[in-house]
């Protein structure tokens, strides 16, 4: 009886270990393909971002697309909050204009990504692709706005680059799914 119980515990632990290995493989395998296909995605960033969500450990490729899109929404909201804090301080009027533009662009991006998530879930990957492209473009437009006036430096460059990577991950996944 003692041996049977020990064997059950052993096999249970083995199954847990195998599940962890399999889930790591889908995240790593997907990130490898995504990083190869998209110049906007760093492999390590992809693995760290997707791997941070506990659902990624049991997700399929479609699920990873939804996870990456949700991560983009979360990061976009953080950017809007960060910009809001900057706007509450005394800032140059030109900088303020570009920051306000970014707030609007990230609101548009959030809407696009929410629609893309619905498209992922309904397996309309072509539509998800279009909407993730729009969200990525909104972030690039935000960053490019600061370059319009000499002497203005974007205070959100790193945040924008991370957002571009998150949306590029989702975008690449739509292509892997056949968009």
UniProtKB/Swiss-Prot annotation:
SMART domains in UniProt: PMEI
Tissue: Expressed in pollen (at protein level). Expressed in stem, but not leaves (at protein level). Expressed in pollen.
Keywords: Allergen, Cell wall, Disulfide bond, Endoplasmic reticulum, Secreted, Signal
Signal peptide from the UniProt entry: 1-23
Subcellular locations according to the entry: Secreted; Secreted, Cell wall; Endoplasmic reticulum
Family that this chain belongs to: Belongs to the PMEI family.
Protein name: Putative invertase inhibitor
């Amino acid at each position: 009886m003692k041996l049977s119980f020990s064997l059950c515990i052993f096999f249970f632990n083995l199954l847990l270990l195998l599940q962890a290995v399999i889930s790591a493989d889908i995240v790593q395998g997907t990130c490898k393909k995504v990083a190869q296909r998209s110049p906007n995605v760093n492999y390590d960033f992809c693995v760290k971002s997707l791997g941070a969500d506990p659902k990624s450990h049991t997700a399929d490729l479609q699920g990873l697309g939804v996870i990456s899109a949700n991560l983009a929404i979360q990061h976009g909201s953080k950017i809007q909050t960060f910009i809001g804090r900057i706007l509450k301080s005394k800032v140059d009027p030109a900088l303020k204009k570009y920051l306000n533009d970014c707030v609007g662009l990230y609101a548009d991006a959030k809407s696009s990504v929410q629609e893309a998530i619905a498209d992922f879930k309904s397996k309309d990957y072509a539509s998800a692709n279009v909407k993730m492209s729009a969200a990525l473009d909104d972030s690039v437009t935000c960053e490019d706005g600061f370059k319009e006036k000499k002497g203005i430096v974007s205070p959100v460059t790193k945040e924008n680059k991370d957002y571009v990577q998150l949306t590029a991950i989702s975008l690449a996944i739509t292509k892997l799914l056949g968009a």
